[in-house]
Amino acid sequence: MTATSPFSPQEIAAEGIKPEEYAEIVRRLGRHPNKAELGMFGVMWSEHCCYKNSRPLLKQFPTTGPRILVGPGENAGVVDLGEGLQLAFKIESHNHPSAVEPFQGAATGVGGILRDIFTMGARPIALLNSLRFGSLEDPKTQRLFSGVVAGISHYGNCVGVPTVGGEVYFDPAYSGNPLVNVMALGLMETPEIVKSGAAGIGNPVLYVGSTTGRDGMGGASFASAELSDESIDDRPAVQVGDPFLEKSLIEACLEAFKTGAVVAAQDMGAAGITCSTSEMAAKGGVGIELDLDKIPVRETRMVPYEYLLSESQERMLFVAHQGREQELIDIFHRWGLQAVVAGTVIAEPIVRIFFQGAIAAEIPADALAENTPLYERELLAEPPEYARLAWEWSSEALPTGTTAGIEIQGNLHSWQDILLTLLNTPTIASKNWVYRQYDHQVQNNTVFLPGGADAAVVRLRPLEGQGSRGAGEQGGVNSLSGVAATVDCNPRYVYLDPYEGAKAVVAEAARNLSCVGAEPLAVTDNLNFGSPEKPIGYWQLSEACRGLAEGCRELATPVTGGNVSLYNETFDTQGNPQPIYPTPVVGMVGLIADLTKICGQGWQGVGDVIYLLGASITTLGASEYLATIHNTVAGRPPRVDFDLERRVQKVCREGIHAGSVRSAHDCAEGGLAVALAESCLAGNLGAEIHLEVSPTQLQRLDEVLFGEGGARILVSVVSTQQATWESYLQEHLGQNWQKLGIVGNTDTDLAVLTTDNQTLIRVSIEEMNDRYQNAIARRLAL
């Protein structure tokens, strides 16, 4: 191969390569790359593929544990559920594609994460999503929001995997740069977990699935750049998915894996053929030769650069045992899919690409996939000014209140009015407008409808092939067991204090699982941040990773893998970059041994006794109340007390397992008052609450009602077990619990009073329901 002429600085920059990185490429190759090779380095050395800014920080995460079977580095993490069952799970982002083409961007995000799951040999059983948008009053946000939800529902519904839960936040910080994070779970169906490292010199390399076109060109590099007003021109970088073809691909792959003829498998996601060949070769310590002329195409006159960087969807790369390739090809043809032998595993650790009989690219595999650039940036010596100023805020800056309410700018707002305002806030309000577009009951294993509990719960039914696993016959599998999953992040907490905020994310995820009776097992994380090249951006990323690592260690929930999405920024009208709130989303899974011992968040029976587990210490700093009612984003988020978190969560789980706790709900955004309202609405039952309020607290009733703090769970217990339950609480929580009141009838209100019977809130279920259920639809004028 002869050296080509140097590229112009503009051509190099267009591939997302920095000048010093290009010099390193030339040094490694001993020559200048050609156009195809330049493109290969551009995508593989992008942040999206190689994590060059975040990799040093990710090393802090705990990644091992007694149930961890596969940790970071593979397509998905895998945990042991016992009884011969193994769960694969992973979260991924599709933020930038969704910003320029919301429907396809979100749809292909679903398709991509599902491929990560079934590539391991697992059948997808559930999807969750974590979404962030700008203000819902903004017409642009309405378009993005509607498009993303439609894209998620289209792909998930068509492919036949239920979307069982998630979260949606709205904040101007995400205007123009929405976050679309999708988590998938799958139950292992193959005798062995399928890995991605190529092996066996001379083994054939198979291309299977859909055809290759020009869609998704440069998607990985696009996902590693900041968005601008011109990003709409990058629509060709957004892939187009076919969920019906993916449904066939799932079945064909699982059937193929069960033959034992597959050595390794890799999804063609970001960077397409380039990524799958280089990663499989590098992980196996071998090389791969691939002939582009063998690749099935959907467009004519494609050149190597286009083949190698295409991100056409629903494609996979297999390494097969020599002599068994036709067996696999026949399976894929029977499912109406493409399948061809396109290459070979070679001893030389090189990715060598042929096109029209000549070498089109030749690069050491580890230069693309392992030995990639690494940037260890200098951390700010002290927190940035915005954080220090925010931390100076205290509740003394707010007007004091009375039992009648609080006066804001000359107008008295009753606590009841404030509660209704918060229930009408899209971030807090019901997401039924979203959920009703998803098929959340396909596969017939969904235990709670979305919104009915603090975490999604899916029944674990024996799947085909599990009898061959160590547990013996399928009948040995406990069909009463289930898996719970949640996705969580309070981005305002993380913005105001990345370290404490990230710890709170892990704590809330575990708390949500505990509220349904699940034992938290492991984490997959999605780090959505701004530019790490800016000191504040890197400080936020570094501090959040430190907090996540500590939280996962404290709660014994190792990280099995995840995704990093940086450069999430938009430009204001003056052309200044504005980063999103730092948003480290935690996806956490938990095990439920007995599905008859679970509970949702709604009250269950008239006369049940209501308790608040945990400390009564709360803060208005970083709260939804402060942001919505006072239009102020300031203060410190609640500090996490991991010892109390562990005790409160364990008490909740054990209370559920013993049959004492009939409902459980985390006190999160909006504080105690919102949690009470949500439990009333979920159970369609009122409640009478009596709060012990000290003379000092009388002036800060907003903190009592709407203050936020960790380690707080609202539970209801059948009255006949009150004495036993309170004795149990005293033994395990000491003074860290309160009896609040009793559950009322369907026609009673939510009444919150002081212990001397002064009414703070009295509101009907009907009025709360109108605000809560219709908040999003009203803003969309639907």
From Swiss-Prot:
Cite the active-site annotation: 48, 94 (proton acceptor)
Tell me the compartments it is located in.
Answer: Cytoplasm
Q: Which Gene3D superfamilies match?
A: PurM-like C-terminal domain (3.90.650.10), PurM-like, N-terminal domain (3.30.1330.10)
Q: Which domain of life is it from?
A: Bacteria
Residue positions annotated to bind substrate are 93-96, 115, 239, 311-313, 565
Q: Where does Mg(2+) 1 bind?
A: 92, 563
Please indicate if the UniProt record lists ATP-binding as a keyword: yes
- Annotated GO CC locations: cytoplasm
State the UniProt keywords alphabetically. ATP-binding, Cytoplasm, Ligase, Magnesium, Metal-binding, Nucleotide-binding, Purine biosynthesis
Q: Where does Mg(2+) 2 bind?
A: 116, 267
- Residues annotated to bind ATP: 51, 90, 525, 562
Q: Which GO terms describe its molecular function?
A: ATP binding; magnesium ion binding; phosphoribosylformylglycinamidine synthase activity
Could you tell me the Gene Ontology terms of the biological process aspect for this record? 'de novo' IMP biosynthetic process
**Is the Nucleotide-binding keyword given for this protein?**
yes
> Per the UniProt record, which EC number(s) apply here?
6.3.5.3
Q: What's the catalysed reaction?
A: N(2)-formyl-N(1)-(5-phospho-beta-D-ribosyl)glycinamide + L-glutamine + ATP + H2O = 2-formamido-N(1)-(5-O-phospho-beta-D-ribosyl)acetamidine + L-glutamate + ADP + phosphate + H(+)
Give the main localization category. cytoplasm
What assembly does the database describe for this protein? Monomer. Part of the FGAM synthase complex composed of 1 PurL, 1 PurQ and 2 PurS subunits.
Tell me, in a sentence or two, what this protein's role is. Part of the phosphoribosylformylglycinamidine synthase complex involved in the purines biosynthetic pathway. Catalyzes the ATP-dependent conversion of formylglycinamide ribonucleotide (FGAR) and glutamine to yield formylglycinamidine ribonucleotide (FGAM) and glutamate. The FGAM synthase complex is composed of three subunits. PurQ produces an ammonia molecule by converting glutamine to glutamate. PurL transfers the ammonia molecule to FGAR to form FGAM in an ATP-dependent manner.
Please state which protein family the record places this protein in.
Answer: Belongs to the FGAMS family.
- Alphabetized NCBIfam families for the sequence: FGAM_synth_II (TIGR01736), PRK01213.1 (NF002290)
Q: What is this protein called?
A: Phosphoribosylformylglycinamidine synthase subunit PurL
Its source organism is: Nostoc sp. (strain PCC 7120 / SAG 25.82 / UTEX 2576)
